[in-house]
Regions:
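N-terminal export signals
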Residues: 5-27
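Mature catalytic domains of secreted/periplasmic carbohydrate-active enzymes
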Residues: 8, 32-479
Length: 479
């Protein structure tokens, strides 16, 4: 017998003789212990504020698809090719005459999104390059003047409206094409360009005009997603116009005022990982590709495990999540990217009950490697961090479930109320999950549902589970 087995056998006899273990502890599906503790436990259990108006659709549809598509898709390097690649403006604009996405089919995009459980879409109407995907009257640098000659946004909007699939619009304030934009060589800006006549006031009027077009000519809009407003000079009139024209539109925090929600991007700022729940509305955004948001010919992709963990990390804290793909120049989402999205759907659909209409209650356990949500008399355990082994400790939670189920495939999960050998001095049994199939599911994120006869979470203030740090979602300038 090796040392671990010997100590385990010896330790099993000691607490049993002292009456410290619950003799009735069973695997999932067995009888609950008659001597389970009656002490109530509790957690934060707070949702971020709802709007109380037409924007509340956003809390019913929490998982969306982001799409980055533009002239940069022709080159297939990066969506910021012109800036990062140091491509002269005149040379870059030669891509304009090549734009002809013959296989663009927005219904194919939406089919893929819905197959993964996504319920809304956010589309780049104008990225930093300044190219406009709609029939704008304010610049000729738009899709109608290309060989394609069709309003790409119109086609997408029509497809979305046929399905009652909310459409959100991305719009970059930075513009590398407009001679009015004050390019000064700051981050994500070109150097001052010959022949430009920068005028901030006139450019803001240009932006307002384009926003009015977008919010007037394409039916109901679910959201407006600003990006890269470098000056950060506040102008509440612009978002006010959006709200007047599109009352159901949620607006992010990257525009001319603080907007409705924060936007953590990729894992650039790890402080977003620290709160157990958010006080301000949040929509995280991530791409399937590691290097680019737009189409990249030589892209390396994130693993399924990484992406499902990222989704769980935010959804379990009452946040929305946007997952991005970059169609190629023909309008086709690369097969590898599409396969990743479909695979995420096979994970998301069985476990989504653990996210939808649940409360974040992670404060009831000291285990920082899991997140907990609650719905009625059920708790959901999200193993968003790769587990070290087959056991998950939920200390100090000491309530016996009636059953425990692995949502990924529906199999029962073993559990016990007992004392871990290394914690024998505490003499306080708590709930532990056992023999989880971590090797079999090593490439994905496990979610366990615990069903209780009655679940009273009042009484614990979460002191043992408080995470350090502040909530970055309160910072309207967070990116």
């Amino acid at each position: 017998m090796n040392r671990r087995k010997f100590l385990g056998a010896a330790a099993a006899a000691i607490p049993a003789a002292q009456g410290l273990l619950f003799a009735g502890a069973q695997a999932a599906g067995g009888q609950t212990p008659a001597s389970q503790p009656a002490e109530p436990v509790g957690g934060d259990g707070k949702l971020v504020p709802r709007f109380g108006d037409a924007r509340d659709w956003w809390f019913q549809k929490r998982f969306g698809m982001f799409v980055h598509w533009g002239l940069y898709s022709i080159a297939g390097w990066h969506e910021q090719l012109e800036w990062r690649g140091g491509v002269p403006r005149k040379e870059y604009e030669q891509l304009f005459s090549q734009w002809n996405p013959k296989h663009y089919d927005p219904d194919a995009w939406l089919d893929m999104a819905q197959s993964a459980g996504m319920e809304y879409i956010c589309f780049t109407t104008k990225h930093h390059e300044g190219f406009c995907h709609w029939d704008t009257r304010l610049t000729d640098f738009n899709v109608m003047k290309t060989p394609y000659g069709k309003d790409a946004l119109r086609k997408l909007a029509d497809a979305c409206h046929r399905r009652n699939f909310p459409l959100c619009l991305y719009y970059s304030v930075v513009d590398w094409h407009s001679p009015l934009y004050p390019n000064q060589g700051r981050s994500h800006e070109l150097e001052p360009q010959p022949g430009d006549h920068p005028d901030r006031e006139k450019y803001v009027e240009f932006v307002k005009g384009q926003v009015r077009e977008l919010c007037t000519n394409y039916g109901k809009i679910g959201g407006f997603w600003w990006d890269m407003y470098i000056d950060k000079i506040k102008d509440t009139s612009i978002n006010a116009m959006i709200r007047q024209l599109q009352p159901a539109a949620v607006i992010n925090n990257r525009g001319f005022d603080e907007g409705d929600f924060g936007t953590p991007e990729r894992d650039y700022d790890r402080s977003w990982d620290m709160p157990l729940s958010f006080k301000r509305r949040v929509e995280a955004n991530q791409s399937v590709g590691m290097e680019s948001w737009g189409f990249r010919k030589e892209e390396d992709y994130y693993s399924h495990r990484y992406l499902t963990s990222s989704i769980a990390k935010y959804r379990a804290r009452d946040a929305n999540y946007l997952l991005n793909v970059g169609p190629d120049a023909n309008g086709v989402i690369p097969e590898k990217a599409a396969g990743i999205v479909r695979q995420i759907g096979t994970w998301y659909k069985p476990v989504r009950e653990a996210f939808d209409e649940t409360l974040p209650v992670s404060a009831i356990t000291a285990n920082r490697n899991v997140l907990l949500t609650r719905k009625g008399n059920s708790l959901y355990v999200h193993l968003y961090q790769p587990p070290d082994g087959e056991e998950v400790r939920l200390r100090p939670l000491a309530i016996a479930p009636e059953r425990a189920v692995l949502l990924n495939d529906g199999r029962p999960v073993e559990w016990r109320l007992d004392i871990a050998p290394m914690e024998w001095k505490d003499h306080k049994p708590y709930l532990r999950l056992h023999r989880l199939p971590v090797e079999e599911f090593a490439g994905t994120t496990l979610v366990v549902r615990l069903d209780f006869a009655s679940l009273d979470l009042a009484g614990i203030d979460g002191m043992a589970a408080k995470a350090s740090g502040t909530d970055p979602a309160q910072d309207a300038a967070a990116r």
